[in-house]
Amino acid sequence: MPYERDCLDNDVRLRAQNLRTHEINLAPYVPGATLRADIIAKYPDGRYKVFDFTAPNFIKGVISYKEFAWHYGHTYDNDDQLDDHNANTFNNVTLANSGSTNPPRDITYPETVMIVLNGNFNIAQCRAFPVNQYGLTHKDWRLSRNNSPDPIHNCQWTPIGCYSNFFVMKFNQREGLRFILPACSDSAYNQYNSGTLAEIIWETVKHKTVKWFTGERQAINWFTQKNLAYPDSANFIASRAEANYIGNGNFSDPSRYY
């Protein structure tokens, strides 16, 4: 009978796993779901520094050029002397090989910054752009504006899977990064109503975590553990955010607790 043929699959565990996978892949689209943005700084010697932001509704902020410095936060580095270089310079230069005439290379600041968005972001409205060491879009503050003349926006973001996007930019040691990353919302729900807007602002709390990695392999392992999208330096998608059938939607996955 057709009914009997349809019921040959009695793998209850697989059915449960499929339901779990479906639940995870729809969860980021629920109103109030968490957004997760990762700003990944790659340094000339192959080290990585990741700024991990989580919040509902929107993520906005700025990372100063001082925060991009690898040694930022150490006791010998402080914000009182903005124009001073790190006193322990030997920790932040690479010396040329023996016999080479190349000068030492400063590895304090990143040469590449990648932005990875995970969640139901409104990509058409997401913007990110460099600012100078004083947070300005022009060296003359009187000509500085709220947005850069050419921010990363809309179709410049490259999609990864269901709900992740990324962009890669070259960087300068005296630049910071400003980003404005809103979530998608129901068009019938007016976020700009005064009461609604006040509630959204009140409920939106941004959390930042900073991770240091000595190489890309460590970075890939962390992104994979946390179920975050990550395209590696060869533009290969090394990790995806959506759940699949190989384990990152598993009921017994311990990484979701840490």
UniProtKB/Swiss-Prot annotation:
<comment type="subunit">
    <text>Forms crystal-like bodies by self-assembly.</text>
</comment>
<comment type="function">
    <text>Major component of the virus occlusion bodies, which are large proteinaceous structures (polyhedra), that protect the virus from the outside environment for extended periods until they are ingested by insect larvae.</text>
</comment>
<dbReference type="GO" id="GO:0039679">
    <property type="term" value="C:viral occlusion body"/>
</dbReference>
<dbReference type="InterPro" id="IPR035239">
    <property type="entry name" value="CPV_Polyhedrin"/>
</dbReference>
<protein>
    <recommendedName>
        <fullName>Polyhedrin</fullName>
    </recommendedName>
</protein>
<dbReference type="Pfam" id="PF17515">
    <property type="entry name" value="CPV_Polyhedrin"/>
</dbReference>
<keyword id="KW-0842">Viral occlusion body</keyword>
